[in-house]
């Protein structure tokens, strides 16, 4: 799953590994998915239009989330992110 936009590819769903596609994810499916998924930093109008054109809005709402994970922590290194999800 990309921690920036909450996109999950099939490989990441099976492994449960968190990543941030823009800077540390080696999974090409995740990187490709994140390029087309709405980013949280976009204005609301951009997010709404992207959600309509790329995938159903229900799919975004039903994405699996880690309840204990912090929401978009920019200070974690890739190793810290992996360590958190390997506990």
UniProtKB/Swiss-Prot annotation:
GO CC term, one of those recorded: host cytoskeleton
Reported modifications of this chain: Palmitoylated in the N-terminus.
Cell membrane recorded as keyword: no
Region (Disordered): 58-87
Keyword Transmembrane carried by entry: no
Cellular location(s): Host endoplasmic reticulum membrane; Host cytoplasm, Host cytoskeleton; Virion; Host cell membrane
Keywords: Host cell membrane, Host cytoplasm, Host cytoskeleton, Host endoplasmic reticulum, Host membrane, Lipoprotein, Membrane, Virion
Motif segment (PTAP/PSAP motif): 67-70
Membrane topology: Lipid-anchor
Major place of residence: host cell
Stretches assigned to coiled coil: none
Role, per record: Small multifunctional phosphoprotein involved in virion morphogenesis, egress and counteracting host innate immunity.
Free-text comment on this protein's domains from its UniProt entry: The PSAP motif is necessary for the release of membrane-wrapped virions from infected cells.
Family assignment from sequence similarity: Belongs to the hepevirus ORF3 protein family.
More info: The viral particles present in feces and bile are non-enveloped, while those in circulating blood and culture supernatants are covered with a cellular membrane (quasi-enveloped).
Name of the featured protein: Protein ORF3
Species: Avian hepatitis E virus (isolate Chicken/California/Meng) (AHEV)
High-level lineage: Viruses, Riboviria, Orthornavirae, Kitrinoviricota, Alsuviricetes
């Amino acid at each position: 799953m990309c921690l920036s936009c909450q996109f999950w590819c099939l490989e990441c769903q099976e492994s449960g590994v968190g990543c941030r596609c823009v800077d540390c994810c080696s999974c090409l499916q995740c990187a490709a998915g994140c390029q087309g998924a709405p980013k949280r930093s976009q204005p609301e109008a951009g997010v709404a239009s992207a959600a309509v054109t790329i995938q159903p809005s229900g799919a975004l709402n039903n994405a699996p989330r880690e309840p204990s994970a912090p929401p978009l922590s920019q200070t974690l290194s890739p190793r810290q992110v992996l360590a958190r999800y390997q506990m």
